């Protein structure tokens, strides 16, 4: 490859373009550098949600989906659609791993446990998939009390007080199907940590295996009591639900114990790994625990290449991603993020590949150890900007990929002022890195992977903590290039970058090139 061709892809995670500036931290923040880029350089907008990124129509985008599409250079149809389609066409009920779990419980007169994020947010899971599992259990002949559901309440990708509605919806659906009952509730803050805060994971594990948590007679009361204490869905402390028939199957009918079967129905991997490790790894050292014997543990999708577990929906093998193409052509690349988004610029951007490509360097900066990021809205952006700027000066990379996590991670807290501060921190970091890149002869693309900080308030005035379906920016800086930049989707970014680098676009990338090829090559 031509060593003089260099490109920086800067991802402002959660930096959506607002419909209503009054509720947008992006619009209210003082961001002189990004504002300057809009004034001076060619730009367009990108679709980052729904069908354009392989999600159901109208479904908000997320970081996993966004980075997968960005790296693939095409629309990548996501697990949520694959699973939903399997339920619709009936193949779900013949899925080897799922049927095996149900039959394991039935054959040994043990329990089937279904656990996962309890919402229709569509980012980590979907309740329709849980209902599909209940139907499968019914078809396999499991008794009503033999199927326990452990709800990891959301409140991050959904309304913070939406849990009660989901519980009532579930109870109605379970009654219709004829199997399944809610056995425990805990917020995703505990059950779905991904930053090795093992004390959180341990509290969820103790609830599931020992029943350690406040006891309630019904799940609606359990959640309302949490709300009364000012604790919303994401942060609900462990709660077990009493059952009259608790000893009908096994010694403790709602707990996960020896001989049971578990289906973890989250389809997104990053926040499912820690709890899976606690249940399945013989040499686990995150905390002291007793591991149930003869436990069949099934995951909805592959959570980690190192897990030797039954998987219901294997990952699609994505070939010809941007990283793979550049590596095969002799290019060097850099992937950089803080902990919260490290998997996204590596595993997801590489199409589900854990290992670096030849010539790929990685920069990981630890995220701050705070309970929620509104307490430190700058997160680790200053250190990350320093590290990447230094790397760009010290090595020649064909492609550098950098993610600033702040607008997304702070946006999830619903704290408007903190989200404004997060956007301002990213503006400062972006200035530092972009100026360093331009000094070294890099062209630059500045984008976002989905919306979030563009809407921090609901119409009723309550905090909005979820992602949005907003369009996202696409700004290009390249000497001699004056545009235009056509509007497109995330899957168009990789072929556009290859064109800016003067490289051929592989057949596997069917995304569109959003710049005139002759002008990009000539600049």
Curated annotation (Swiss-Prot):
The active site is at 63 (phosphoserine intermediate). Binds 2 manganese ions per subunit. The keyword Isomerase applies. One of its GO terms (molecular function) is phosphoglycerate mutase activity. Signal peptide: none annotated. GO terms for cellular component: cytosol. Keywords: Glycolysis, Isomerase, Manganese, Metal-binding. Mn(2+) 1 binds at residues 408, 412, 467. Its EC number is 5.4.2.12. This is 2,3-bisphosphoglycerate-independent phosphoglycerate mutase. It holds the Pfam family Metalloenzyme. Pathway: Carbohydrate degradation; glycolysis; pyruvate from D-glyceraldehyde 3-phosphate: step 3/5. The gene is gpmI. Monomer. Its cofactor is Mn(2+). Belongs to the BPG-independent phosphoglycerate mutase family. The keyword Zinc-finger does not apply. Substrate binds at residues 124, 156-157, 188, 194, 268-271, 341. It is an enzyme of class 5 (isomerase). It catalyses: (2R)-2-phosphoglycerate = (2R)-3-phosphoglycerate. Mn(2+) 2 binds at residues 13, 63, 449-450. Catalyzes the interconversion of 2-phosphoglycerate and 3-phosphoglycerate. GO terms for biological process: glucose catabolic process; glycolytic process.
